[in-house]
Structure formats: structure tokens, C-alpha cells
Amino acid sequence: MDLKGAVALVTGGNGGLGQRICHALAREGAHVAVMYARSREQAEGVAGELASRYQVNARAFGCDIADGAEVERLVGEVTQAFGRLDILINDAAYNVAIPFGDLDNLTMEAWDKIMAINLTGPMRLIKAVAPVMKAKGQGRIVNIASVAGLSPTGSSIAYAVSKAGLIHLTRCMAVALAPDTLVNCVAPGLLDGTRATANLRSEQVERAASSSLLKKPADKDDCADMVVAMCRTETMTGQTVVIDAGRIFH
């Protein structure tokens, strides 16, 4: 797909990785809908920077992706504002750090909220955008999962299971939406400078990075570049690419 003039909806577009994805897409000439859940001012700042730096149309849109009615409203507003919708990036996520062995503190309320945002939310969005993309004859969907979805590690069981579900949802939707819409997934490892590492001490980040083959955290720009590649591809679908500096092998 030629990204110049395409319209991309990026959920969590005001976050650390989300911002990099927005910039990478705009750099290719794509117009960007920056979706946020709470930080309107931050999202509007991202949209303004995209518009001024890359001369593209970029706007901020608020949405609680756990709410089906809000998702339908969001897709309608984006389609009306831009006149089309070619790309969906499911980057919005939620987590509560709970050690795997601490099942007493893994409440069903926490489980339900994590699943609602990390798995059901992307499903709602995919269902909402699918008819728009089908009518146009092509579309690209990229889900942002995690290496926690590939092995029983990470900051909580609920988060790991939600990301495992998102990886398999990618495969299932690749089948369901073929041949018009291609669906792929990026599974990052620990990313420095994101919400996930903001709550960690520097020595914790360094210790985690040192356990990777490349002895450093995964790179947000590498992830964003892979998202762009998945949007441009014509023959790749149903795939998950891990970007974690080789930490998954430890």
C-alpha cells in the first residue's frame, strides 16, 4: 500500500511507542488520527507536531475503547473527518503490575479491565473498521502485542494472557478479512522511555536489558518502522514479529 495520502487511526497515539508510530506514518505521507483515552492536551500536541513537521492532516480523537458505542462513534468521526480510513494501529493498552504468584491481588476487576482494553477493545475496533476497508478494497491492521504474549513472563498474568489473545486474534482476523485487509502484529520487548519502564528504577531497566542478547532495551523506532513495513506490504498477513533485542531467548 502506498502510504502517501492514506489515513491511519492510531490508538494510544499519545503514548511513548504510539507517538513514534504516528511520526513514522506521517513521515511516509499518511494522515493520522491520534486516539487518546485521557490525555487530550498531549494528543493534540502530537497531532499539531505531525501537521507542522510533515504537512499532513492530523487530529486528536478521544475514545474509551472498552465501550462499544464509543468505538463506533470514533470510527464514524474519523471517517467523516478524513473521508476515508485505510489503516488501524491497535496500540492502546492497560496493565496493573501484579506478580504471577500473587493471585490474591489479581482481582477479577483488574482482569476484566485489562481484557476489555487489551483484547476486546482491538476486536471492537477491527469489527468497526472492517466494512470501511472492505468497501475501499484494501486495508491494513497492525496490532501491538508483547513478548509477554509469547511466554509466561511479564508484569501480570492478565496482561500476558491479553497479549497472547491479541496475537491469535491477529491470525484469526487475517483469515476473516482476507483478501482485502492484511492483519499483522508487532510484539515488542521492554521498551525504554515508555509507560512500562517509567515505573521501574533505572537499575531494573538495566538488569532487564542486560538479559537480552544485544544487551539493551528494544528500540521504539525499530517497532515503528516495522509497523510502517506492515502497512506497506502486499503479501504478508497473519504474522507476528518480535522486536526485543533477543531477550525472548533468555
Model-derived features: positions:
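Active-site helix of classical SDR
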Residues: 126, 162, 170
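The beta1-alpha1 cofactor-binding region of Rossmann-like NAD(H)/NADP(H)-dependent oxidoreductases
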Residues: 40-41, 61-74, 108, 221
